């Protein structure tokens, strides 16, 4: 067999062994995808003993391409929620997550400066301690740019030494916080449910009776609130007649209007229109019905709702828009993106015509447009290769193959659509590409690190590196967890999700979810901090490398 054939065969073997190891669980917690790294270490140990030669160029390409695939698909996944997670509702959680990253970075500086640990090893320990594989790839990239040789081997070994406690340390921090504050999980779950039920969704329906005599005879668009597009009137009831109103529909005293909007906007409309009445808000009687419609028609992508003329042509109202799990009040200037879910209300005989304009082809949600994928990857590599200079830094910085595709993917996923190209990717396809990418990357890192892993563990500084990893993992988590509980007054289950999200660690999230299985607090806080944390985890080793290398 050729060297390339042997290399590919061993990569497949590493993936099989590693994924098998990753499925081993102790009390419900396992290595997960990190098992591939240890599968590579085991295989490399025996290949070195038997003198098998691997093709270095193939390994290098597979490692870099796997990293690119992983970070690009991560960016596409979290992109729509990345910028919204920075809004006011998630500021406190994201601030605590950033504090964990900052404290972890300070710990790396202390390990490097005080303990005199070489920079490449310190960054490898950091990546393993925070269980973030893209951070390892980013660190290797920047050190290679700085001219530090043989970083793959040393960083891979130190990463592997710190990784196991990186997972266990999060679980230990959760347990100690629970013990220290004498937390009663059932009480925490009840408190979270009570708080979340008050604001379970961003938009609400109410029915208002027109009692303001000044509105009699005015058209809908002339009433304050509708002209500002703060709320949507999805239907109007007058005596026994029920219609979907247009902007030009005249309003009469005693009409009942069903409105959709956020709490503040609806409160204003109560003052303007009249008092709230009990009226059906879900069932649509007569010929009026509502449908949830998915935007799949390429002809409407990037167009504004006003330009489609759906309301004018068919008398259909778009009362809600759900984008990446976030509910919005649609306005005439709202631009449609692939995968948007619209709540449409109209007469049965014309609603289907309006739906055909939007698309609602469910099978398209299962298809992947490959052209945007490779455009995004290509742009990401180009952006990652652009040097930018910061005063005081000795070398030009680059986002690299880890940061470039991530930043581009975040932006493209946020934009959503350019012409007929859309960057929506079905979750199953995204997960498949992401898993393939990280398996390839970890398999190569394991193969390159395995030759010296056991020797370092037994005869070298392996145990010392483990100790530094415990320090980097545990100290930031326990400090921020205590502050979040003591001063931030955060729910314990929310703190568990925050700690897991700050390490981008799915096994830790699984553990947090099992603390109270019927409660979504941990998953919600994990999802809130995950996008920003993933970005910062990839960028932080690069900044640390440049700062410490220059010092």
Curated annotation (Swiss-Prot):
- InterPro entries annotated for this entry? AAE_transporter, RCK_C, RCK_C_sf, Transpt_YidE_put, YidE_YbjL
What is the recorded membrane topology of this protein? Multi-pass membrane protein
Domain of life, per lineage: Bacteria
Keywords from UniProt, A to Z, are:
Cell membrane, Membrane, Repeat, Transmembrane, Transmembrane helix, Transport
Q: Where does the protein end up? A: Cell membrane
- Indicate where this protein is primarily found: membrane
Q: Which residues form the RCK C-terminal domain?
A: 191-275, 277-360
Q: Which cysteines are joined by disulfide bonds?
A: none
GO cellular component annotations, sorted alphabetically?
plasma membrane
GO MF terms held by the record: monoatomic cation transmembrane transporter activity
Entry annotated with the keyword Hydrolase: no
Output the GO biological process annotations, alphabetical, semicolon-separated.
Answer: potassium ion transport
Q: Where are the transmembrane segments?
A: 4-24, 28-48, 65-85, 95-115, 157-177, 370-390, 402-424, 438-458, 463-483, 492-512, 529-549
Answer yes or no on keyword Transmembrane helix. Answer: yes
The record's comment on protein family reads: Belongs to the AAE transporter (TC 2.A.81) family. YidE subfamily.
NCBIfam families according to UniProt: PRK03818.1, YidE_YbjL_dupl
Entry protein name: Putative transport protein CGSHiGG_02670
Can you name the source organism? Haemophilus influenzae (strain PittGG)
């Amino acid at each position: 067999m050729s060297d390339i054939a042997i290399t590919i065969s061993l990569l497949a073997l590493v993936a099989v062994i590693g994924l098998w190891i990753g499925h081993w669980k102790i009390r419900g917690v396992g290595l997960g995808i990190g098992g591939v790294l240890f599968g590579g270490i085991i295989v490399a140990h025996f290949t070195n003993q038997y003198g098998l030669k691997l093709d270095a160029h193939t390994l290098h390409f597979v490692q870099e391409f796997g990293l690119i695939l992983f970070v690009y698909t991560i960016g596409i996944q979290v992109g729509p929620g990345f910028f919204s997670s920075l809004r006011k509702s998630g500021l406190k959680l994201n601030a605590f997550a950033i504090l964990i990253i900052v404290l972890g970075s300070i710990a790396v500086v202390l390990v490097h400066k005080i303990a005199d640990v070489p920079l490449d090893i310190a960054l490898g320990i950091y990546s393993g301690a925070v269980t973030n594989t893209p951070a390892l790839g980013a660190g290797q990239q920047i050190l290679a740019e700085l001219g530090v040789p043989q970083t793959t081997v040393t960083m891979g070994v130190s990463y592997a030494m710190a990784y196991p406690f990186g997972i266990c340390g999060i679980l230990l921090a959760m347990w100690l916080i629970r013990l220290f504050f004498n937390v009663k999980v059932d009480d925490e779950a009840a408190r979270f449910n009570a708080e979340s039920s008050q604001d379970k969704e961003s938009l609400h329906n109410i029915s208002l009776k027109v009692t303001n005599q000044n509105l009699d005879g005015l058209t809908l668009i002339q009433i304050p609130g509708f002209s500002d597009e703060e709320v949507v009137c999805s239907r109007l009831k007058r005596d026994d007649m029920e219609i979907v109103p247009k902007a030009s529909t005249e309003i009469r005293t005693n009409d009942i209007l069903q409105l959709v909007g956020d709490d503040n906007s609806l409160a204003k409309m109560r003052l303007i229109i009249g008092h709230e009445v009990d009226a059906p808000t879900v069932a649509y009687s007569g010929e009026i019905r509502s449908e949830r419609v998915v935007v799949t028609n390429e002809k409407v992508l990037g167009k504004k709702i006003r330009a489609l003329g759906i309301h004018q042509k068919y008398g259909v109202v778009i009362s809600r828009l759900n984008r990446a799990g976030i509910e919005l009040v649609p306005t005439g200037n709202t631009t449609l993106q692939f995968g948007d879910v619209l709540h449409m209300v109209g007469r049965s005989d014309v609603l289907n015509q309006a739906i055909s304009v939007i698309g609602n082809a469910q099978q398209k949600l299962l298809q992947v447009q490959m052209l945007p994928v490779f455009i995004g990857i290509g742009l990401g590599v180009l952006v990652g290769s652009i040097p930018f200079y910061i005063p005081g830094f000795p070398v030009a910085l680059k986002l690299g193959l880890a940061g470039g595709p991530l930043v581009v993917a975040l932006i493209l996923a946020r934009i959503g659509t350019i012409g007929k190209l859309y960057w929506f990717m079905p979750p199953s396809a995204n997960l498949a590409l992401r898993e393939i990418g990280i398996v390839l990357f970890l398999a190569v890192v394991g193969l390159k690190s395995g030759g010296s892993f056991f020797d370092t563990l037994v005869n070298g500084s392996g145990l010392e590196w483990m100790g530094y990893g415990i320090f980097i993992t545990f100290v930031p988590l326990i400090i921020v967890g205590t502050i979040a509980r003591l001063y931030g007054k955060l729910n314990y289950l929310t703190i568990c999700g925050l700690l897991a999200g700050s390490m981008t660690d799915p096994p830790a999230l699984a553990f947090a979810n099992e603390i109270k299985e019927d409660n979504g607090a941990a998953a919600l806080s994990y999802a809130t901090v995950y996008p920003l944390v993933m970005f910062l985890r990839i960028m932080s080793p690069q900044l640390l490398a440049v700062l410490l290398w220059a010092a």
